[in-house]
């Protein structure tokens, strides 16, 4: 189950965008071997809102593009398919039978700014940020160079499957 909640009014959100986001999340999770019913919440917000969240949770007082709030724990260097592939989840990890993977807060205002800056479509940027955040929910990180290379490779492979190129 993918929940999308539009809490901003600066960028028009239509059914096509929502459906593409849901489709790309579902595809990414299948590619990452999430073979259990799941729940992810995506909240579309503006730069002011994401700045507040970034300050509250990361102590960084500036707007960012996307924030991820994973619900599962991961050992350093491990991702979902390394730890949870055939795992028996506890009832506390489930909500109405769905594994709660976490929440995504995405600034559509920042996505639009970055799409212009990088010279590609708003759809491509929004899908990229969504994939990036989903991978964080699955334990991927980019703090170390080797982790960054792996994460970028996964992002590009998924985008390529949707014909979304830079």
Swiss-Prot record:
Name of a matching Pfam family: YbeY
GO biological process: rRNA processing
SUPFAM superfamilies reported in the protein's UniProt record: Metalloproteases ('zincins'), catalytic domain (SSF55486)
Transport recorded as keyword: no
InterPro entries documented for this protein: MetalPrtase_cat_dom_sf_prd, YbeY, YbeY_CS
Required cofactor(s): Zn(2+)
Sample GO molecular function, one term: RNA endonuclease activity
The protein's Enzyme Commission number: 3.1.-.-
GO cellular component, as recorded: cytoplasm
Gene3D superfamilies: Metalloproteases ('zincins'), catalytic domain
UniProt cross-references to PROSITE patterns, sorted A to Z: UPF0054 (PS01306)
Superkingdom of origin organism: Bacteria
Homology family: Belongs to the endoribonuclease YbeY family.
Record-given protein name: Endoribonuclease YbeY
Organism, scientific name: Clostridium botulinum (strain Langeland / NCTC 10281 / Type F)
Lineage: Bacteria, Bacillati, Bacillota, Clostridia, Eubacteriales
The encoding gene: ybeY
């Amino acid at each position: 189950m993918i929940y999308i909640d539009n809490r901003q009014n600066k960028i028009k959100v239509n059914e096509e965008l929502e459906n593409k986001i849901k489709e790309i999340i579902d595809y990414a999770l299948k590619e990452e071997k999430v073979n259990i019913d799941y729940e992810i919440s995506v909240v579309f917000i503006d730069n002011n809102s994401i700045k507040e969240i970034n300050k509250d949770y990361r102590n960084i007082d500036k707007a960012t593009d996307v924030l991820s709030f994973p619900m599962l724990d991961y050992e350093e260097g491990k991702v979902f398919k390394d730890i949870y592939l055939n795992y028996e989840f506890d009832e506390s990890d489930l909500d109405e039978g769905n594994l709660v993977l976490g929440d995504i807060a995405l600034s559509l205002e920042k996505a639009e700014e970055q799409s212009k800056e990088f010279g590609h479509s708003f759809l491509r940027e929004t899908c990229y940020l969504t994939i990036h955040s989903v991978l964080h929910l699955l334990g991927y990180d980019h703090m170390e160079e080797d982790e960054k290379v792996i994460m970028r490779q996964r992002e590009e492979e998924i985008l390529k499957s949707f014909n979304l190129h830079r």
